[in-house]
Amino acid sequence: IEETGRIPKELYRKMAQNQYFGVTIPEEYGGCGAGYVAMAIVMEELARASVSATLYVTSPNTLLGLPILNYGTEEQKEKYLVPVMKGEKEGTFALTEPSAGSDAATQNTIARKDGDYYIINGRKAFITAAPLCDFAVVFAATDVSLGARGITAFIIERDTPGYSVGQPERKMGVNGSPTADIILENVKVHKSQILGEEGKA
């Protein structure tokens, strides 16, 4: 796992079949709804064999899965959350930036409204699984004058024009879960891709 830079596809599918990606996600969306204690047990047991493997489980159960579960439309849940539970798609959570860290209020990624669309420019750094993911939940400022209250979350698919991924970071460990930047250059996203409400990320 550490040498190849990811867990094998066969193992990934088995993890999905065993509902590792949906320990905290309700059954109606493909999870098992067992809660956080169960997730901690799963993580602890996985870590005995591979710490990298735990990162594949953490994201869909927390930073990626819960925002979609709690704030996504039913269409977004069916399109993104359910396939992640099945192991058909991988997603990631993109907040951290080179100059702002994880402080959303000082980030430099900007989403400019253009009719029913938003034009997004910026760079996210140290994003877990960025080289592997099919989509990302990206945070961008839709109103810079409002600081943290002007931040909006967008679901952006990897094949959207202007979306690219940087080279994987050279790390001291946990290399089985690659980390890289996500670069957004004039990425055009429809308003239907907003996660939750504008300015309420």
Predicted segments with their positions:
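Structural signature of FAD isoalloxazine-binding scaffolds in flavoprotein oxidoreductases
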Residues: 33-43, 103-107, 183, 189
